[in-house]
């Protein structure tokens, strides 16, 4: 059997195992013949998606029906709910008898095949033997985290967050396997650029890529300058395109918690750093210059940097009450 056939078999088997396990949560989402979202966040996502698909309100980024009477900006960016609404409308155009909630509650289960394919692609990019890839796929299928993210009714956006984590790793590895191919660098930049449109915090995916390039720079083993510049340009432009539909961005807001000018600023920093690494060779003088530039660029977002550090170190009391911040293994035992 060829390697491609083995990888295809691993993907199919592991995806079906993961999907079957995720279907175990059906009883939490199917009550008295009615499909319902599983959890508070999933409920609000479903409400916003259904409004965008069928209601006169259409798609909204400011909700005047929450935090009454003043209303509130929705911290979740536009892309996930908008695309889900478009997907629902398209599906019902072909299959008009489909129950809208039946469709939405099962999207996370179907999406297992996408995330599993990316995981297999990552393992293949690492040149692992097929039995190791099979073991990784089985671990993904049996993981409580997979069941938590992909369970029936989990309309929350977290399974798509996982998609972008895997997509960035996959595109980065493919590029580094063939660093001369500028098109692969561009795909990495696009993945990094559009990720915040699905969750504000996904701009953080730029950090490990920058760290990786910084290590290559110190070792004098960077990819060619053309590929580096292609990465920088595609990252900035795709971020800008992802920001254009965002009302907070068009209103001139600069907030970490909203898809705004903050995210374009982060992309600009990453673009500048990548360009500097591509233009200047490593030495003590250039290292000092790069460090100085980095510190100056952090000043406008220093408060957000401190807040992010507190989040990573779990120095926020509120985290104890947020399900997403808890161990998936604890969840699997106590559910």
Locate each region found by the language model.
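Transmembrane catalytic cores of multi-pass membrane glycosyltransferases
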Residues: 161, 186, 191-335
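Membrane-interface coil-to-helix junctions
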Residues: 16-114, 143, 156-159, 163
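Conserved acidic
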Residues: 10, 177-179, 222
């Amino acid at each position: 059997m060829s390697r491609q056939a083995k990888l295809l078999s691993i993907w199919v088997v592991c995806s079906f195992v993961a999907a079957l396990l995720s279907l175990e949560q059906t009883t939490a989402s199917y009550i008295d013949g009615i499909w319902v979202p599983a959890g508070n966040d999933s409920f609000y996502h479903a409400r916003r998606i259904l409004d965008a698909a069928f209601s006169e309100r259409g798609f909204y980024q400011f909700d005047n029906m929450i935090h009454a009477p003043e209303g509130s900006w929705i911290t979740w960016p536009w892309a996930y709910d908008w695309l889900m609404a478009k997907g629902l409308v398209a599906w019902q155009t072909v299959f008009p008898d489909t129950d809208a909630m039946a469709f939405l509650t099962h999207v996370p289960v179907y999406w297992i095949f996408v995330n599993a394919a990316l995981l297999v692609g990552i393992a293949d990019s690492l040149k692992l033997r097929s039995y190791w890839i099979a073991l990784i796929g089985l671990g993904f299928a049996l993981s409580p985290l997979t069941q938590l993210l992909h369970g029936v009714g989990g309309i929350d956006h977290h399974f798509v967050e996982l998609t972008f984590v895997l997509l960035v790793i996959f595109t980065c590895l493919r590029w580094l396997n063939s660093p001369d191919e500028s098109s692969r660098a561009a795909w990495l930049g696009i993945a990094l650029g559009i990720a915040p449109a699905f969750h504000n915090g996904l701009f953080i995916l730029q950090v490990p890529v920058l760290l990786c390039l910084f290590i290559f720079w110190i070792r004098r083993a960077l990819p060619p300058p053309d590929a580096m510049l292609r990465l920088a340009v595609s990252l900035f432009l795709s971020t800008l395109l992802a920001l254009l539909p965002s009302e907070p961005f068009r209103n001139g807001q600069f907030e970490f918690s909203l898809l705004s000018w903050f995210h374009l600023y982060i992309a600009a920093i990453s673009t500048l750093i990548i360009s500097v690494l591509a233009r200047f060779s490593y030495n003590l003088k250039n290292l000092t210059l790069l460090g100085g530039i980095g510190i100056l660029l952090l000043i406008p977002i220093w408060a957000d940097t401190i807040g992010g550090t507190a989040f990573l170190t779990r120095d926020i009391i509120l985290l104890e009450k947020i399900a997403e911040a808890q161990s998936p293994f604890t969840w699997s035992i106590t559910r």
